[in-house]
Curated annotation (Swiss-Prot):
GO molecular function, one term: unfolded protein binding
Gene3D superfamilies per the UniProt record, alphabetical: 1.10.287.3240
Coiled coil: 13-38, 152-176
Name recorded for this polypeptide: Vacuolar ATPase assembly protein VMA22
Keywords: Coiled coil, Cytoplasmic vesicle, Endoplasmic reticulum, Endosome, Lysosome
Disordered as annotated region, ranges: 89-123
Lineage per the UniProt record: Eukaryota, Metazoa, Chordata, Craniata, Vertebrata
């Protein structure tokens, strides 16, 4: 009876693993399409504005990231990745500010300036009126970043599923008597 339950669990984990692999392949194809679309839109923008108008010479001297990758690990060791826009606070950052002492009496303090103001839109490096294709390129690459984070989470889940499947198969081998 235990062997039957173990086989059912192996089947469930295997089906889940195959579903995750199918999702990963679909996301890879979508990522490839977004990146290809982004580069094509970027080349259209270079054609519209001139080859020297869209290039490294227009980049800001000091760049700030617009997104970060957030990670978390669940109790079973499964990691999850997601995109966090710059300027938004994570729960850890909010909690640390509230724990600070407050001065209730005396001179009013001047508010502390934010150490990290929201970063400027990089499209403004290329002028005020940028072609629509440049905006499309930016949107395509942003979607690609989100897909990459989703793919990393899926890959982590696939690795976890493979280890679960191997453990279950080892248990199943120990339960079944060896036939000559």
């Amino acid at each position: 009876m235990a062997s039957r339950d173990l086989r059912a669990e192996v089947d469930f984990v295997l089906l889940q693993l195959l579903g995750d692999l199918e999702q990963l392949e679909a996301k890879r194809q979508a990522l490839n399409a977004r990146v290809e679309e982004g580069w094509l839109s970027l080349s259209k923008a270079r054609y519209a504005m001139g080859a020297k108008s869209v290039g490294p010479l227009q980049y800001a001297s000091h760049m700030e990231p617009q997104v970060r990758v957030g990670t978390s690990e669940s109790q079973d060791g499964l990691q999850k990745f997601w995109m966090v826009r710059a300027g938004t606070q994570t729960p850890e950052e909010v909690g640390s500010r509230e724990a600070a002492l407050r001065r209730r009496k005396g001179l009013p303090r001047t508010p502390e300036p934010d150490s990290s103001p929201a970063p400027q839109n990089p499209l403004k490096w290329f002028g005020i009126l940028v072609p629509h294709s440049l905006r499309q390129a930016q949107a395509s690459f942003r979607e690609g970043l989100q897909l990459a984070a989703d793919m990393a989470s899926l890959q982590s889940r696939i690795t976890w599923g493979q280890s679960q499947l191997q453990e279950l198969q080892e248990k199943l081998k120990q339960l079944e008597p060896r036939a000559p």
